[in-house]
Design a protein with these regions (language model features):
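N-terminal and secondary-structure boundary signal
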Residues: 1-179
Length: 179
């Protein structure tokens, strides 16, 4: 892990999310280090279920809006997730985005909301167990993915974070087999 850097800052309330994220990105070399002009960047939120922001179950919309504003300086931000249920459909995603505040975050930041429920098989040549996997198509087609996890406890884990949130790139119920 040599050369990897982590930035940690106290953020006592979500009203400071954008300022703190800007501070972090600047400390890591600026957004131009991560986004090239014209790129389409997926903001992979943790949208476990249709729960309001105050429930602290999903990525907070202030964090998604802040990330989208930073991406928008050079590219296009697209908010997405693939909930764990069998109904990964546009109508379900629409309700999920409304209830979690992601629709408002997109409106406030200029981000797009992704309703594409199609899948793609991607090659994993360095994989030790899997050499390919099915993922949601927007992930395979994006120029980059910014992971916006929600730090919380989990029934199968002590806590969840960035790696666990990436289970959301697997379509619908296929996540179950990977747990």
């Amino acid at each position: 892990m040599e050369g990897n850097r982590v930035y940690l800052a106290a953020c006592p309330d979500y009203g400071q999310a954008e300022a703190k994220l800007r501070e972090a990105v600047a400390a890591l070399g600026g957004m131009e280090r991560f986004v090239r002009p014209g790129e389409r960047i997926l903001l992979k939120a943790n949208l476990l279920r249709a729960a309001p922001p105050e429930s602290a179950i999903c990525t907070h919309p202030a964090v998604a809006a802040a990330a989208a504003k930073l991406v928008a300086a050079g590219g296009t931000a697209v908010i997405t997730d693939s909930p764990g249920g069998a109904l990964h459909k546009e109508a379900v995603l629409r309700g999920l985005y409304e209830k979690t505040g992601m629709a408002q975050a997109a409106a406030a930041s200029g981000a797009e909301l992704c309703y594409d429920a199609s899948t793609r098989t991607v090659s994993l040549p360095a994989g030790r167990v899997l050499k390919q996997a099915e993922v949601i198509a927007p992930v395979a087609e994006a120029d980059g993915v910014f992971d916006l996890p929600k730090l919380k406890t989990h029934v199968l884990m002590s806590m969840t974070g960035a790696v666990k949130n990436l289970f959301g790139v697997l379509p619908g119920l296929s996540k179950v087999g990977y747990h």
